[in-house]
Amino acid sequence: MSVQEDNKQDFGSEHWPEEIRYLSEDKTLVVRFDSGETFTFPAEFLRVESPSAEVQGHGPGQKQIVPGRRHVGIMAIEPVGNYAVRIKFDDLHDTGIYSWQYLHKLGREQNDLWQAYLDHLAAAGLSRDP
């Protein structure tokens, strides 16, 4: 996937993907940005950090813990205009629209977000396993 240089300002994103590739065997999504940064996202991580209201809630402090997604995969990745992708997971979740900004943020904060997720699972007595 490539994005034209002159479209960057139109959508208010300072980070644009140069390549988005799903590795089905590893269940990972690789996103390479024009900044030179490349992030590898496990499908499970993207699922539990979905930007959908179902996961994030409708306001601060409403984020839901999504357990049991250790083996989730991605069925489809669809472009949404020039600013995002919709990821369809094999657990049938498909309401998250991942903007370039959000994907870049997830990449930069992946370790901290993943640890927070694991901590919340443990505190709630929940598991990554289905």
For the regions a language model picked out, list residue spans one by one:
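Motif-centric detector for short Cys/His coordination patterns
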Residues: 1-130
